[in-house]
Structures are given as structure tokens and as C-alpha cells.
Amino acid sequence: MLTRYSASVVLGACLFAATAAAETDSKVDFGRDVLPLIRQNCITCHGPKVQMNNFRLDRRSTAMRGGTRSVIVPGSSASSRLYLRLSGNQFGKQMPPTGALSPEQVAVFKNWIDQGAEWPDALANDVDPPPADAKAVRMVMALRSGDAATFNKFVAEDPKSLNLRGPNGSTPFMFAVLYSDAATVSQLLDKGADPNQPNDSNATALMWAANDLDKTRILLAHGAQVNARSNDGRSALAVAATKAGAAPIVKFLLEHGANPDPAGPTDTAALHQAAAAGDAEVMQLLLDHGAHAKAAGEDTLSAAIETDCKKCIQLIEKSFDAKAYSKALVDLSIHSEHYDGIKLAIDHGADVKAVDVEGRTPLLFAANSDLLPLNTVKLLIDHGADVNAKNMYGNTPLYLAKLHGNTPIVDLLLKSGAKPEVIADPALKFQKANTIQSAVERAIPRLQRADISFLQQSGCVSCHNEALTDMTLSTVRKAGFKVDEQMAAKEVSGVAQFFELWRDRLYQGNAPGGVAYSLVGLHAEHYPADLVTDAVARYIEMKQFPDGHWGYGCGGSRAPLCGAEISNTALSMRALQFYAPVTSHAKYDKTIQMAGAWLVGAPAKTNEDRTYKVFGLAWAKADKRALQQAMKELLATQRADGGWSDIASMNSTAYATGEAMVALHEAGLPVTDAAYQRGVKYLLSTQLEDGSWYIKTHSQAVQPYFDVGFPHGEDQWISACGTSWATMALALASPETHPVTAQVVR
């Protein structure tokens, strides 16, 4: 949160400066116009002592890096959370919480960001960290490659080298904790390794070891500080609780003085992490040692219900009031298949008319679900939900439901008093390509330009757009098509740099969404394994549930990501197949096998599920019979027009069609197969003259919209994804491609 200082004299001077700087044509001076506003309004909650949402605004380096997401995007106030939070409540409570800034002051921030967010070195409040020691870097590289002989030689020559400054200030010893066994860690400590030397993120070796009981024991026996906390507020206890099944480690840490209830951001609380992991045993341990559910935050309640862990819910359900259950109800309605959890929240007094920061009600979420949860919609209506409520974009439950076609939910809403709405389709100019070659060649430049534009404007890699473009470029190259290699290299570099900024957070169990997608995309572009990919792989392994699957929690009901456990499991497994750290293959092989086994029995509810079940089983290469059955089920949903739809009540789309075709081909379906050829005809007939395919978004907005130069306005992001899948499917069928063939049982 952004908090206001009361400094009337200074404020008067700043208002004068703000008025001048608010003029659109005026050049904003950071020191004169922006810095005083930051100091007065922001530092209490985002300064040296407190960093709410892991965001610190008093230093240039941390401000530009952002917190849990990019906050300042130079050149684009429209995609900068700082400006959006200051200017209104579209994406959270308007800041500062004590009262909005004046329009002139808000304009200062807007103009400063749009002019490039210049922040002079003299005012950066940063002390550039010393460069990594060359010897330390060589030691780290030896560790990650499994070259124990070279590493041990360095240690034998100079034991003090264990504490040298390596990448991001992390010592070779810290990396030894990641890449070596417990016996080696013990030996290195005996040689003088410092267990408490922090890196640039204030993380210590104990935080990196927190998922390994033997290493944790050894470090504490050698004096590691059990309650040390990183800049993000995470302790070893919070990191340990992130992984399901961590009770032995959590118990050991608690017995050795770990604080179960430290003050700080609620998402760093160990109890919150345990609830998100669905681990009742760990939650019980924490509560027995003094953790307080309220201190862990209301999201802890939502997390426990979302994981469908009944014991987890029982442990904390009496700690929260109706207000907390109202928030949980909104969160749960995103995953509207949680009927029992939604009923539980209502039974505890949740307000069915509750809204989130974007004006979205539980009914808006439920009506928007691809799973068509009629019982949930009826439950909410029966308890008084407003069938004509609108989110901040003016969308009603009926509008969102009709995006999924004429369904029983549409009928129920109309019977319950929803005002009729007509969804107008845009005027589209189709231009059927005469050949696959011409269709693919029209699409490639548009995809590349939009891809790099998204990365530059958003400051993040998106949840799947970047990866899909990477996969598309790899596919079309193999088929003999030309791409802009300079632009492609720039995009891959940007993605890698983004994850480098997140590397230490990944070690601590914190990550942005879609990391598995990103690794699959990087591999498609032949990105070599390094410390960054190791960190992402470690995070992915940490988040696997004991039954082998990966869940997906997110803040909006957007297909195909939210609640899509099959797709996230398949992609996570694939990412680990590509980038499992070389020193831990046995551990990761088990993780991959568990994922493949889970996919065999996973029930597919949508074509997104069916598609990724085919992908996953093909990648697992473990159960041919299950793969054949999954292919048969996906083929059975092809429409008469040759396309596939997201769900049966919707029309065919290039997204669902291209995705299904690529998956089937990956599983062995030849492009000469009649079903594949029908898909080709559908895609060729639905491409637009600008080279794109149009897909109408059927989910509520999550990110602030901005134009990346792709057609179709506010539908452009999903249209770009659909264009990627369509382009891949066509490129695979081009004359230059030599497909694998397989017999498919129908």
C-alpha cells in the first residue's frame, strides 16, 4: 500500500511543482516533481523498513524491478501498475489508502512514466553491488555442471573461496547447498564456509536448503540463523512450507526456534504457504507452535478451500469472519468447480454480492467458467446474487455466459431476471490463402512484432504469449520459412533477463505465472540450460503435489490457464524434461514419472484438457494405450467444419483447432490423415486478410489492456495466441515438413 505523510509545507511546494509538471508538454523532472511525491506518499509502506507486496520504491533498482509484478514500465503508463493504482481502483484499492492524490499529482506520475521514467543516477539511492568474483563464478559453473573435481580443487587451494562473492552476491557455498549432497555441505562448513552470509536479496544458504531435511539439520548445527529473512520477507520456514509433504522439515525448524508467525506480507507466512500446498499436517504443526490464521491473511482461507483440503479448512475455518468468507467466495468462484467450498463460504455468512477490486462478483466468475457450473450459478442466485451486476468493463453475468454459447446457464439467468443482451460479432474480412506457404508467411511478421511489443510494454513475459511465439518460430523454421532472427534473439534474451531478475525469488518458492510455458518456449528457441533455467526447474519441482499433478492458482478466470491442472501438469513435466538440473536427474525423473502417471487418470472436461492430455501422454511415453484413447477422444470432438471448439456449446476457433492439431501430430498423427487435412482447410478458410486469425476473448480481463500492434483491439492477445497455434499447425503440414506417422485407433 502507498501511505501519505502529513507535511503541509512541503506538500504545498510539491503541489505547485506538480501543477507545472502535469502539463502534457512539460518535461517531468524526477528530482523536482516525482521524488517528493514518492517520499510523502509511498515510503512508509514501500521503503527501507516495510515492502508491502514485496515492492520497494525508495531505490531505483527495486522500483524498476517491481514486486510480485512489474510496477513501472518506462514509456507506458497504461501498463504500469503504479499509475493504475494511483489513478483509480480498477486494479486494486486506489492508493494512497489515506486518500487519493490530486489529479495534477497523478498526472505527474503518468507523464513521467510516458516520458520514459527517467531516474537519474544521482538520485537512484542504489549502491552498485561489486561484480562477482571470477573464481567464484568458475566454482559455481563447476557445481551446476556436476564437475566436483574442479570445484574441490578450488576449495583445496583456498578454502576462503567458499565465501567469495558469486552471481548476485551468492557464495559458491550457497550454490553447493543447491547442487551438492548433504555430506559435501557438511564438509564445506568444516572447511570454513559461512552459513549466514547473505546475497544481494538477503537470502541465506538455509533458505536455499529448506526443502532438504539433512542439509537443514547440518546448517543449523553449524550456526545458521533460523529466522533470517530475505528482502521479500521469506524465512526458511516459509520456503519449506511451500512444498507439500514438508512436515519433517517444518517440525525440525520449529523445534529449533523458527518463528511461525513473523510480521510481514501475508503471502510470506508459512501458514499461508502450507494452505496453498494443501498440507494439513504442516498447518497443524504451525498452529500448535503459535501461528495465527488471521496473521497469515484472508488469502490463507481461500487457499485452503481451493486445494479442497477438508482438514486444512477445519483447522482455520473458525478464525475468520463473514468478511473473510466473502473474499474467499469471490476467489473460489474463479474456480467455480469448487461447489462445496462455495457453499461452505455462504454457510459462514459470505455475501454473494461481494466484489473484488475490479467489481467482479462470484456470479460473474461462475457464469464465465468454461466448466459451465450450473449448480454453482443456481446456488448463488438462490442466495440473492444480482443477475444484472456489472464488472468495471460493463460486463454482466449474462454477457459472460453467452460468450460460451447458448447454455443452460444462459437460460437460468434469463429466467432469473437477467436483462437480455446481444453480443455483436466484429466485421471480419476473410482472405483464404491459396497455399499453406502464403498463410504462414502472412502470419509470422505480425506475431513477431506483437511479441516483442508485449515484452517491451508490459515488463513481463506474459503467461503464454511469448512462449507460443517461440514455439511457432521454431516450428516454421523447421518447415523452411524465414523469420526475423534478430527480433527472435532479442525476445529470447528479454525472457531470460526477466527470469534472471526473479532467480532468487524462484529459489524461495515465489514465481510469476506461466513459468513452465516459458521454459518450453525457451527450449524451442534452443536456449541453453543455465542458472536461470535451473532456478525455474527447481521452483516447478517444489510446487508439485504428492499425487503428481500441478495446480494453477491465478487471479482471474481466463482460459486456458486458470484451474487448468492438466495443461499445467503436462507443461511442467515437459519443462523438467528439458531443463532438469544435471546434478539432480534421479530426483527429477521421479517427478516426471509421477506427472505422467497422474495424467493417465486425469478426467478431461474441456478441449483444452483433452489437448494437453494428448501432449502430456505423448511426452511421457509411458502408456501407449492411454495415449491412443486420449487421441481418440480429442479426434471425436472435431466439428463438421473441420475445426475444434473450446467446449461443445461454442463455435470452432483457430486457437482450439491449431492447438488440437499440433497435439495430435506430436502424438503421432500424420498430417496426411483426413482429420488433420480437414483442420488445414478450416484454418486456411478462416485466416483474415491481415494475416491473423480472430478469437473473441471469453474471459474477464486480468491485466490492464494495452495495444501491442496486433489486430482485433481488446481481443488481440488471445487472437495472437490463436494465430500462433494456427500457424504451427499449418507449418507442420507444409510440403517441406516430414511428419511422423502412427496408427490411431478410432
Range-by-range predicted roles:
Residues M141-G146, F175-D181, W208-L213, V239-A246, ...:
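Ankyrin repeat A-helix N-terminal signature
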Residues S8-A18:
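Bacterial N-terminal signal peptides
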Residues D147-V155, D181-L189, D212-A221, G245-E255, ...:
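Ankyrin repeat structural motif
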Residues G192, N227, G290, S302, ...:
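Preference for long, amphipathic alpha-helical scaffolds in soluble/luminal domains
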Residues A20-A148, K153-E157, P167-T171, F175, ...:
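Aromatic- and Gly/Pro-enriched helix-to-coil junctions and flexible linker segments
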Residues M1-V9:
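Bacterial N-terminal signal peptides that target proteins for export
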Residues S161-L162, P195, V226, P260, ...:
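Ankyrin-repeat inter-repeat connecting loop/turn
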Residues A132-M141, R165-P172, P198-A205, R229-L237, ...:
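Ankyrin-repeat boundary/"N-cap" motif
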